[in-house]
Amino acid sequence: MLFLLFITSLACYGFGIILAKKARKGQKAIFFFAVVSMLFPLLALKYGGFAFSILGIPFTHSLVIPMGISFYTLQFIGYLADIYKNGQAPEKNFIRFFLFSSYFPQILQGPIPRFAQLSETLYQEHEFDGETISYGLQKILWGLFWKFMIASKAAVFVDNIFNSQETIAGSLYLIAGILYSFQLYADFLSCVFLSQGISLLFGVRLSENFAQPYLAFSIKDFWRRWHISLSLWLRD
């Protein structure tokens, strides 16, 4: 995972500098090539085996997909898009850029950070702040509570119903379906709390990524509330 992340970070860092130096006329081709290069590892690892089978080529190896690859791929594309579309200045220091790309509290479940937003707090000096540490620990405890006391408990009932070999009443399937949606909610919310809490221990506040999606009034509003940073990424 770290090797691929390092190589992809190095490529994105280089593309960012090249994009900024290139005249506007030549930027489009560079940007297109850069985006394809960022997507290639993700697509190759996720769909490489399927592509070989379609082509009739025997492929018996098991591809291991690194954790967080989807998030940091979108993060890199967003960084390059900000340089290409919005004229954002690229980061010239690779160590600082790699810190941005590999900041582990958000790399597994998001949010998908914008460089200008995360770098504001990531690169500044941090002093010990008891109040921030305390708030971070509260977030972590809430994350563990939602994961083990709610999501895991709901999963036991849901699995027992859907995996049962016996005849089950339709009402129980309905209840299991509702509980499954709540299980997904609790799972994602727990990850949000954990990533935010761990980041606060380092003095870095992550953006909100979850806003009570089950209170949405439309599918569009639901999606916007479920994964805020991804919705903003797609919009921009």
Give the positions of each predicted feature:
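Membrane-embedded transmembrane alpha-helical bundles that form the catalytic cores
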Residues: 1-236
